[in-house]
Amino acid sequence: MDKIVIEGGVPLRGSVDVSGAKNAALPVIAAALLAEGEHEVRNVPDLADVRTLGKLLGHMGCEVVRGEGDRRTVRLRVPAAVTPEAPYELVKTMRASVLVLGPLLARLGRARVSLPGGCAIGARPIDQHLKALTALGAEIRLEHGYVNASVPGGRLRGTVFTFDAQTVTGTENVMMAAALAEGETVLRNCAREPEVKDLGDALVAMGALVEGAGTDEIWIEGVPSLRPLSHAVIPDRIEAGTFLVAGALPGNDVTVRGCVAAHQEALVEKLRAVGAEVTKVEGGLRVIGDGRPRPVDVRTAPHPGFPTDMQAQLMVLLCLADGTSRITETVFENRFMHVQELIRLGAHVEVDGRVAMVKGVPELSGAPVMASDLRASAALVLAGLAATGTTEVLRVYHLDRGYERIEEKLAPLGARIRRVRG
């Protein structure tokens, strides 16, 4: 099993490029199921989850290939007849596999999809997906770990539906389903993340009638059919945010290229609050970590609030602050599993339910640590960069689900980091 080995305490200087957003690429690729023909999705990161979705679509009868000259381009050929099944063997490691449910129901009128896997960071049920699809006219049964769904009459019907809680994949799944439904659909209390807007833009490019994607209310007028997709996904705001935090670590100076400043407002506000210098530059943001960070209080929230996917990374910065910070996690339970590993590096963190009190220490010291989920693994890499001595990050398969060869991106900045194949 691979591990990442870091010799920490070395200042980072230079520029780093942001890959395409995994959480935008996955729903856009799933949307290809809505239309027969040849599709092209650009700026796609080469990540485990993306490869898994490609295997899943291949199982369904689609042809999925990476561009020979441009590995960031994925081309898909979707046949008229698609096998509407997502077996457990292919989706057990990837929560986003549920995104095929809406397109399959909309185009084929039936689907059998295994309940999803992914990071073990608390209960992330798909009940909102199923309630909304039922409101669109689907009949759904949960049997033997699978969602068995069908559409009496063959075509979903438009509806008005309010999500009980904001859900990104739920909003995306229902948007895709409603794109081919008969009549008008109005979705309320929708997730407002940039990835939702990106999917809306992709659907519009396919000929869908969608308005309001990226706001809390989305209007969709169903059409009989859609044309093949051609779309470039947005940059990954969480990868960009991870590099921004790296730049804010004491003594560092990092420019993050391809970073969309509008997607980083909540994080930038906190970075400036801790004392980092953040400036807009051509094509991105520059961050300078000037001295020891100041403590701040952080509360995660759905977009446009502070992203839960950046909570662990920011905690690393606050572990070095001159004072005590408070982090409140409101989105997911069990999202402090990285804390025990940070403590191994010398951090002083106490957790009580959804609140973590972070008492800053002058320095961290390297040690072997074990990743528990995707964003925790990124936090441990950041901690290893800041720590003195050697840090080994184990279970980096979590890291590879969301970061495209992170060691190759950090090394040109001066980081002493390498992957050891296991």
Curated annotation (Swiss-Prot):
It comes from Anaeromyxobacter dehalogenans (strain 2CP-C). GO terms for cellular component: cytoplasm. Its EC number is 2.5.1.7. GO terms for biological process: cell division; cell wall organization; peptidoglycan biosynthetic process; regulation of cell shape; UDP-N-acetylgalactosamine biosynthetic process. This is UDP-N-acetylglucosamine 1-carboxyvinyltransferase. Pathway: Cell wall biogenesis; peptidoglycan biosynthesis. GO terms for molecular function: UDP-N-acetylglucosamine 1-carboxyvinyltransferase activity. Pfam families: EPSP_synthase. It is found in: Cytoplasm. Phosphoenolpyruvate binds at K22, N23. The gene is murA.
